[in-house]
Amino acid sequence: MSKDQIIEAIKEMTVLELNDLVKAIEEEFGVTAAAPVAVAGGAAEGGAAEQTEFDVVLESAGSSKIGVIKVVREITGLGLKEAKALVDGAPAPIKEGVAKEEAEEIKGKLEEAGASVELK
């Protein structure tokens, strides 16, 4: 019997017959059908965990470079020269490892000044 013939036979089975088949395979080969599903489910849950720390990354200064430099100075506490170098070097991280609320606030200020910002 080929693999295709087995698949066709399975397609014709009812749900109860499939349940019996799974139980018979588990007993015959000493395996459980639930174990791989549980492992895959656990991995998916781990990937779906909500991120708690964000990096605010300046993608570009846009058309209002001076306004963006002022906001970067306000946020980071850098001097004019350092803030300008940071803005000129975009894409560049502005703040790293900040809470979601603070990251959203910083993003809002920078976008208001005309910058393009991404949270990572």
From Swiss-Prot:
GO biological process, one term: translation
Pfam families named among the record's database cross-references: Ribosomal_L12, Ribosomal_L12_N
UniProt superkingdom: Bacteria
Molecular function, one GO term: mRNA binding
Any one cellular-component term (Gene Ontology): cytosolic large ribosomal subunit
Keywords of the record: Ribonucleoprotein, Ribosomal protein
CDD domains assigned: Ribosomal_L7_L12
Role according to the record: Forms part of the ribosomal stalk which helps the ribosome interact with GTP-bound translation factors. Is thus essential for accurate translation.
Subunit structure, interactors included: Homodimer. Part of the ribosomal stalk of the 50S ribosomal subunit. Forms a multimeric L10(L12)X complex, where L10 forms an elongated spine to which 2 to 4 L12 dimers bind in a sequential fashion. Binds GTP-bound translation factors.
Similarity comment text for this entry: Belongs to the bacterial ribosomal protein bL12 family.
Protein name: Large ribosomal subunit protein bL12
Source organism of the structure: Shouchella clausii (strain KSM-K16)
